[in-house]
């Protein structure tokens, strides 16, 4: 499906493996400890979920998981990071707030990291570069904030967000929002709701996102002549809200649509298109035919 060129070996050779940085025996910052604790708690709750199954909990988890992870891709990624479309603030802010509960951090941090990824893709300065191994690009990079700072410098690439009081507020209070959410979920549905929505939903959301950083730079197909190892993995499309059309994305970073063919499932694009039809999403960016011809591997 959509595989114009399968496993282009020349692109894979661009990522030269780098010597691994020490993971356990290093200085851990407070943020590192908080992150590993949160990720560990989510996976522990996931392990407890089979012993706390109810249909209501499963249904609630599906609703929370889809809405929060769709908010990540719709808000954090395509709206805030790449500015691929514009929203009125009364609509932009609620989506950004909803994304908090996907447990991937606040907008300033997430957007800054992803902008660095595109600026330094597959290089020594890429925050989650595949040249440092699958598990580093998949998850370990998250727990070494000092290393990210060494490679990329300060987060001065998100001044557009730092200038807005709402995003500064989320940055300073994210822990309070997450803890309050977990408490409310527990009070509403007990352990079944907590283990399934936070545990199972959180773990699936984590690994779906992380596979874009790891697997989508190692396996899959390439349709576009990008100067990196980005790839499309079709079967991940529904689970990642359309983000696994990663070679498409790296070819046209500003595009609001990642599934460029009609058969490439892209739930995030469907939501953007819906708001565009309503006149709420404006300045929606899409690649032109000339841009596609220039980037195509088939030319």
Swiss-Prot record:
Q: Indicate what this protein is called per its UniProt record.
A: Delta-9 desaturase-like 3 protein
**A Pfam family:** FA_desaturase
Query: What EC number(s) are associated with this protein in UniProt?
Result: 1.14.19.-
Q: Where is this motif: Histidine box-2?
A: 114-118
The root-end lineage is: Eukaryota, Viridiplantae, Streptophyta, Embryophyta, Tracheophyta
Q: What are the recorded GO MF terms, alphabetically?
A: oxidoreductase activity, acting on paired donors, with oxidation of a pair of donors resulting in the reduction of molecular oxygen to two molecules of water
What is one process in the GO biological process aspect for this record?
Answer: unsaturated fatty acid biosynthetic process
Locate the motif Histidine box-3: 246-250
Protein topology in the membrane = Multi-pass membrane protein
Bilayer-spanning residue ranges: 38-57, 58-76, 174-194, 198-218, 262-282
Which keywords, in A-to-Z order, does the entry hold?
Answer: Endoplasmic reticulum, Fatty acid biosynthesis, Fatty acid metabolism, Iron, Lipid biosynthesis, Lipid metabolism, Membrane, Oxidoreductase, Transmembrane, Transmembrane helix
Instruction: State where it is primarily located.
Output: endoplasmic reticulum
**Chain span(s) of sequence motif Histidine box-1:** 77-82
Q: Which residues form a coiled coil?
A: none
In what pathway does it function? Lipid metabolism; polyunsaturated fatty acid biosynthesis
PANTHER family documented for this protein: ACYL-COA DESATURASE, DELTA-9 DESATURASE-LIKE 1 PROTEIN-RELATED
Q: Which organism is it from?
A: Arabidopsis thaliana (Mouse-ear cress)
Q: Which cofactor does it need?
A: Fe cation
Localization in the cell: Endoplasmic reticulum membrane
């Amino acid at each position: 499906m959509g595989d114009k060129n399968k496993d282009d070996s020349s692109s894979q050779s661009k990522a030269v493996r780098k010597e691994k940085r020490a993971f356990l025996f290093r200085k851990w910052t407070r943020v590192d400890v908080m992150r590993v604790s949160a990720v560990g708690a989510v996976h522990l709750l996931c392990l407890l979920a089979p012993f706390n199954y109810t249909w209501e909990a499963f249904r609630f988890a599906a609703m929370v998981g889809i809405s929060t992870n769709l908010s990540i891709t719709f808000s954090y990624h395509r709206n805030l990071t790449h500015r691929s479309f514009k929203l009125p603030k009364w609509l932009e802010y609620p989506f950004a707030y909803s994304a908090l509960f996907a447990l991937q951090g606040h907008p300033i941090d997430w957007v800054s990291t992803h902008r660095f990824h595109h600026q330094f893709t597959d290089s020594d300065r890429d925050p989650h570069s595949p040249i440092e191994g699958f598990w580093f690009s998949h998850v370990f990079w998250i727990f070494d904030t000092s290393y990210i700072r060494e490679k990329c410098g300060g987060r001065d690439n998100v001044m557009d967000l730092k200038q807005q009081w709402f995003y500064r507020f989320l940055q300073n209070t994210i822990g309070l929002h997450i803890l309050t959410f977990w408490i409310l979920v527990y009070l509403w549905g007990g352990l079944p709701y907590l283990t399934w929505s936070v545990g199972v939903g959180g773990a699936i959301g984590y690994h779906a996102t992380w596979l874009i950083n790891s697997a989508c730079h190692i396996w899959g197909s390439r349709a576009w002549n990008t100067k990196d190892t980005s790839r499309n993995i079709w079967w991940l499309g529904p689970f990642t809200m359309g983000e696994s059309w990663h070679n498409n994305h790296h070819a046209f970073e500003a595009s609001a649509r990642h599934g460029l063919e009609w058969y490439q499932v892209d739930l995030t694009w469907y939501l953007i298109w819906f708001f565009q039809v309503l006149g709420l999403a404006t300045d929606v960016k899409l690649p032109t035919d000339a841009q596609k011809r220039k980037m195509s591997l088939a030319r």
